Curated annotation (Swiss-Prot):
Coiled coil: none annotated. Pathway: Protein modification; protein lipoylation via exogenous pathway; protein N(6)-(lipoyl)lysine from lipoate: step 1/2; Protein modification; protein lipoylation via exogenous pathway; protein N(6)-(lipoyl)lysine from lipoate: step 2/2. Gene3D superfamilies: Bira Bifunctional Protein, Domain 2, CO dehydrogenase flavoprotein, C-terminal domain. One of its GO terms (cellular component) is cytosol. It comes from Salmonella schwarzengrund (strain CVM19633). It catalyses: L-lysyl-[lipoyl-carrier protein] + (R)-lipoate + ATP = N(6)-[(R)-lipoyl]-L-lysyl-[lipoyl-carrier protein] + AMP + diphosphate + H(+). (R)-lipoate binds at residue 134. Monomer. InterPro entries: aa-tRNA-synth_II/BPL/LPL, BPL_LPL_catalytic, Lipoate_ligase_A, Lipoate_protein_ligase_C, LipoylTrfase_LipoateP_Ligase. This is Lipoate-protein ligase A. Its EC number is 6.3.1.20. The gene is lplA. ATP binds at residues 71, 76-79, 134. Pfam families: Lip_prot_lig_C (PF10437), LplA-B_cat (PF21948). GO terms for molecular function: ATP binding; lipoate-protein ligase activity; lipoyltransferase activity.
């Protein structure tokens, strides 16, 4: 009986792909070695312990329909588009060894004519006339009896968009959690013009088979063709939820301030698990009562633009004579946390 399993995703949905990865990892036999190949449409993928409001320009992501996906491994934030090929190697212990999977990826690149080297803990680099450039980054996860190594290969990614989404607005966040390290990167098309996702997948697959001396047929999966994965619906629901992608952020504080024609406003938020645990409001407005009332209402509110806007606008019923000021405030607060 073969010990290998090869899965290739036809879906570009990051939540689907990460849910498949999680389910396979949980239910695979400890004697199995798995290779999962996939790619995501426009997505910022953050590490398990990261703060999306600190790492990402969440406002621009919303404007451009870029998804946020939190993975179950550690490490930093990365931008995925269809110019990235993603790979996941899984194995039970003691078989699991990330140096083996790194060797397989290096062998695949070598078969395509690219000489790359492992650098540090997570990266693969190539030599270019401009110096060493990163073409692959990885992250890892281990449990008591198994582990996985997943990463990306930059084929023809739109590198200009990295800065669009991974450089956040200069919000006044005093955040805990893991900050991403920006790296000098390059696409493999710089060395191999015309290289495709399919060619890279084939090369990685052949290197995987060669290392283990076995071959298996690929299982092609999509939302219409999912293998029998226990608890997949629940895992996908969690992976795609606001509570997981945003609400799992480490605790942080956010200071907002603005001057309106009717007065200056300062808001101080403490946020834990995506909820405001403490809110302070300061103002020099001649009519401070609505803002004083707002502080209490914000306690426990989801740190989400639509919920904050609703909370501010709900005060209009109590303070109708200040409707215009409250609508202006609501619009500003919602925009500031997007």
């Amino acid at each position: 009986m073969t010990t290998l399993r090869l899965l290739i995703s036809d879906s570009y949905d990051p939540w689907f792909n990460l849910a498949v990865e999680e389910c396979i990892f949980r239910q695979m036999p400890a004697t199995q070695r798995v290779l999962f190949l996939w790619r995501n449409a426009d997505t910022v993928v953050i590490g398990r312990a990261q703060n999306p409001w600190k790492e990402c320009n969440t406002r621009r992501m919303e404007e451009d329909n870029v998804r946020l996906a939190r993975r179950s491994s550690g490490g930093g934030a990365v931008f995925h588009d269809l110019g990235n090929t993603c790979f996941t190697f899984m194995a039970g212990k003691p078989e699991y060894d990330k140096t083996i999977s790194t060797h397989i990826v290096l062998a695949a690149l070598n078969s395509l004519g690219v000489m790359a080297d492992a650098s540090g803990r997570n990266d693969l680099v190539v030599k270019t006339p401009d110096g060493d450039r990163k073409v692959s980054g990885s992250a890892y996860r281990e449990t008591k009896d198994r582990g996985f190594h997943h990463g990306t290969l930059l084929l023809n990614a739109d590198l200009s968009r990295l800065a669009n989404y991974l450089n956040p607005d200069k919000k006044k966040l005093a955040a805990k959690g893991i900050t991403s390290v920006r790296s000098r990167v390059a696409n493999l098309t710089k060395l191999l013009p015309g290289i495709t996702h399919q060619q890279v997948c084939q090369a990685v697959t052949e290197a995987f088979f060669a290392h283990y001396g076995e071959r298996v047929d690929a299982e092609v999966i999509s939302p219409d063709k999912t293998p029998d994965l226990p608890n997949f619906a629940e895992t996908f629901a969690r992976q795609s939820s606001w509570e997981w992608n945003f609400g799992q952020a480490p605790a942080f504080s956010h200071l907002l301030d603005e001057r309106f024609t009717w007065g200056g406003v300062e808001l101080h938020f403490d946020v834990e698990k995506g909820h405001i645990t403490r809110a302070q409001v300061f103002t020099d407005s001649l009519n401070p009562a609505p803002l004083e009332a707002l502080a209490g209402r914000l306690q426990g509110c989801l740190y989400r633009a639509d919920k904050l806007q609703e909370t501010c606008e709900a005060l209009i019923a109590t303070f109708p004579e200040q409707e215009s000021e409250l609508r202006e405030l609501a619009s500003w607060v919602a925009g500031a946390v997007r």
